[in-house]
From Swiss-Prot:
Oligomerizes as a right-handed, spiral filament on DNA at oriC. Residues 348-472 are annotated as: Domain IV, binds dsDNA. The keyword DNA-binding applies. It comes from the Bacteria. Residues 131-347 are annotated as: Domain III, AAA+ region. Domain I is involved in oligomerization and binding regulators, domain II is flexibile and of varying length in different bacteria, domain III forms the AAA+ region, while domain IV binds dsDNA. Pfam families: Bac_DnaA, Bac_DnaA_C, DnaA_N. This is Chromosomal replication initiator protein DnaA.
Amino acid sequence: MDTKQIWFTTLGTLQNQILRYDYDTWLKTTALVSVANDLAVIGAPNVTTKQVIEDRFMSVLRRALGEVLGYQVNVRVIISSATPAPSEPVAVTPSEPSPTTEVAEPSFASFNQAAPMLNQLPLGDPNRSSVLNPRYTFSSFIVGTSNRLAHAACMAVAEHPAQAYNPLFLYGGVGLGKTHLLQAIGNYALDRNPEVNVLYVSSEKFTNDLINAIRRQQTEEFRIRYRNIDILLIDDIQFIAGKEGTQEEFFHTFNTLHGAGKQIVLSSDRPPKAILTLEERLRSRFEWGLIVDVQNPDLETRTAILRAKGETLQVPVSSEVIDFLAQRIQSNIRELEGCLNRVIAYANLNRTPVTVEVASAALADLLDTSRRKRVTADDIFREVSQHYGIDQRAIRGRGRSRNVVLPRQVVMYLLREETDASLVEIGELLGGRDHTTVMHGYNKITDDLTSDARLRNDITSLRQRLYGENAR
């Protein structure tokens, strides 16, 4: 057998030995690169998949490969861009099924024991599912390379609450689909079982509910409401940072739900380690489960999003117009869809077909970068400091610790790109560094942007925060 046949058969064996969401999320997109000298090399599409396989699936992989090959091998996982998903393997039925390979379909019945009826709770909307937007479903979410892992993780959580990744922490810039994914989890879970208790709120709503409960002397009712649910979905959790009372209450809410085997899903515009003034005990808990970044959509994904939006609006939009928008609007999904809406409205008001010329006219103010907000050096230092969780004084200083080098080089890049500061002036802002050092840092970021997707996402997110939603 060649490597493709070996891996095809191995995956079929693995389907009987691990949970389906684990298989779909972590193993389906891998490939067997080579088998030689008792060493099997497996290619993973990204760092996260590689780490999860090494942490959780090495023994079962060795065993499955040994069964297929007829001899035992060691396994090494590498990152490989050439890891196409094979044709769906047929699960191999073992002659003597082991009890450990059977996975019972989870039931939500256990979640509802001793939980009060929602309409008996005095705080907030009594119908918790009513806050979920029915349009936010997995089927309406456009999946691309920038969000594939986040989508798979959310699907796993929706299918098997508290059994896959708990908590699940999504982070990324504004308008990238985090809210869509959070609400898709709730809608999917409720479609499977209308009796499941799902609560989707923003961190601001959580804070306001707590304040109102304290004012009305209803803190016990507040705790009953938030601690007797099956799936808690909280958007923009970064806003509880610096609010001691809210963090204290959420800490105990988190512990109660997690200890009871309930699912918690959080979203933020930055990873836990970069949320300044977040209590360490909360930060560590947010890192217990899986942390996934939702990146800015690539060109292919932007094109697919625009096509889907055009079909939803039932408006004929040519491929030329879609390509024009996809190439020029690169910041986020929200702005992308908003620009298409604007172009269509402009065409309707002027009673003209949707053409590239019409799109260019409708978006003239957005595409004219000269009309963007003027960014200052202080703006850049502030946003980079918050994004990476590094104090501004450390970035400006002379220290050379590893955790400061990248943020400092990003500052050099943004100051060079977004302001009129000279290399000498940038060096003065960074502790009196020589202009050649600044040029080296700028060139380093420029070169890395061609191959480092995470760095590209960082720069785009920073520009979004510097300019608002109309970042380039």
